[in-house]
Amino acid sequence: MDEYHRRVVNRLKTARGHLDGIVRMVEEDAWCPDIMKQLSAVQGMLEGTSREVFRHHLETHVAEAVRAGRAEEIVDELMETLKYDKRVLRAIPEVDEI
C-alpha cells in the first residue's frame, strides 16, 4: 500500500475509533455537549479525509484524463462528485480567495 492509501486508511480507522467512543458515550448517557463535541471532531476528520481523496483524484485521474484529451468527460465526473460533497471545497484558501 502506498503512502496516500496508508494515510487515508489510518484517518478512516481513527474516525471509526472515535465513532465507537461516541456510541459508548450515548449508551452511557454522557452529557450531550460532550457528545456533540466528539461528533464535530469526527465530522472534521471525515471532511479532511474527503478533501485528501478529492485532491488525490485531481492530481492523478483528472490530470491524466486532461492530458489524454478527455476534459469534457472529466468535468462531468467532477460535477457529479461535487454534487455529493460540496464541502470538499470548503476551507481551502486557494478556492476561498477566488
Regions found by a protein language model. Give the residues of each.
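Solvent-exposed interaction patches of small proteins and small membrane subunits
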Residues: M1-I98
